[in-house]
């Protein structure tokens, strides 16, 4: 792939994925192509970002389907390495993020962002993109990768695009395929809780305790939902907000049966 990069004329746009693509991924590809970049999509289910009791083995995979979608989307190149290629025997060098990983997903999934940063740093090194595209749904991941690129002087612009949702508001996720019909219906409560926060802020409610409580109560009304966290965080630091403002982002995570989903929304 590094040899191939030297043969590509012009800057590269990278869309890193774990496969089982959906419209959210395709929106990232369209953003890259709109900027006249040679667009590379990577497909790699990264084992090092999964915990020992998480869903690495059952994570949905369908390479034939993904390749057809990428071809239809006009992707110029696909990088789909094996685990052995990315982590050869004896591999023992890691990118460890700092304080941005300590809350939210990092607290619930220890070691997750070390795996994410390591694999993304390797992708940046292999593919040498001018721009890399990530979705807002994984907002903490986006901030951490952007910080990593800046701290390590990686010559890549890390871009974020808005969450793509189903018509009823459910954020698109490859893991949605795990949901039963009743769990999928229940999962809409995450979106409703975020709308509750946004509505309260629009009505000039700036007390984070009140907004968090209302969000939590909304989710708790759904019997199939098991809350991991409800947060009102600073958009830049991810510190919990003392007062809600235009710089606040609401983030939620919950489990529906065996499926864990996350979502977020800017309040302004």
UniProtKB/Swiss-Prot annotation:
Q: What is this protein called?
A: Pantothenate synthetase
Q: Which UniProt keywords apply?
A: ATP-binding, Cytoplasm, Ligase, Nucleotide-binding, Pantothenate biosynthesis
Annotated residues that bind beta-alanine are located at 49
TM annotation in the entry: none
Q: Which Gene3D superfamilies match?
A: HUPs (3.40.50.620), Pantoate-beta-alanine ligase, C-terminal domain (3.30.1300.10)
From which organism does this entry originate?
Answer: Dehalococcoides mccartyi (strain ATCC BAA-2266 / KCTC 15142 / 195) (Dehalococcoides ethenogenes (strain 195))
Q: Which GO terms describe its molecular function?
A: ATP binding; pantoate-beta-alanine ligase activity
Task: Spell out the NCBIfam families in the cross-references.
Answer: panC
> Which of this chain's residues are annotated to bind ATP?
18-25, 135-138, 164, 172-175
Localization recorded for this chain is:
Cytoplasm
Mostly located where? cytoplasm
Where (R)-pantoate binds, per the record, is at 49, 141
Q: Which reaction does it catalyse?
A: (R)-pantoate + beta-alanine + ATP = (R)-pantothenate + AMP + diphosphate + H(+)
């Amino acid at each position: 792939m590094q040899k191939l990069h030297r043969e590509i004329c012009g800057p590269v746009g990278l869309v890193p994925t774990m496969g089982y693509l959906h419209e959210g991924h395709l929106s990232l590809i369209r953003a890259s192509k709109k900027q006249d970049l040679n667009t590379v999509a990577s497909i790699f289910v990264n084992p090092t970002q999964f915990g020992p009791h998480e869903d690495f083995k059952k994570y949905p995979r369908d390479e034939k389907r993904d390749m057809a979608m990428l071809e239809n989307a006009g992707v110029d190149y696909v990088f789909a390495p094996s685990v052995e290629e990315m982590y050869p025997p004896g591999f023992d060098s890691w990118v460890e993020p700092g304080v941005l990983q300590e809350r939210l997903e990092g607290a619930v999934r220890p070691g997750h962002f070390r795996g994410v940063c390591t694999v993304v740093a390797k992708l940046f090194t292999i593919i040498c993109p001018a721009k890399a595209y990530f979705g807002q749904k994984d907002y903490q991941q986006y901030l951490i990768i952007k910080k990593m690129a800046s701290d390590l002087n990686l010559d890549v612009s890390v871009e974020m695009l808005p969450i793509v949702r189903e018509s009823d508001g459910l954020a698109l996720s490859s893991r949605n395929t795990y949901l039963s019909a009743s769990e999928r219906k229940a999962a809409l409560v995450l979106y409703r809780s975020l709308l509750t926060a946004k509505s309260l802020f629009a009505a000039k409610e700036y007390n984070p305790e009140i907004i968090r409580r209302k969000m939590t109560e909304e989710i708790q009304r759904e019997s199939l939902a098991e809350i991991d966290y409800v947060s009102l965080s600073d958009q830049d630091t991810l510190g919990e907000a003392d007062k809600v403002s235009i710089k606040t982002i609401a983030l939620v995570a919950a489990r529906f049966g065996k499926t864990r989903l996350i979502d977020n929304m800017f309040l302004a």
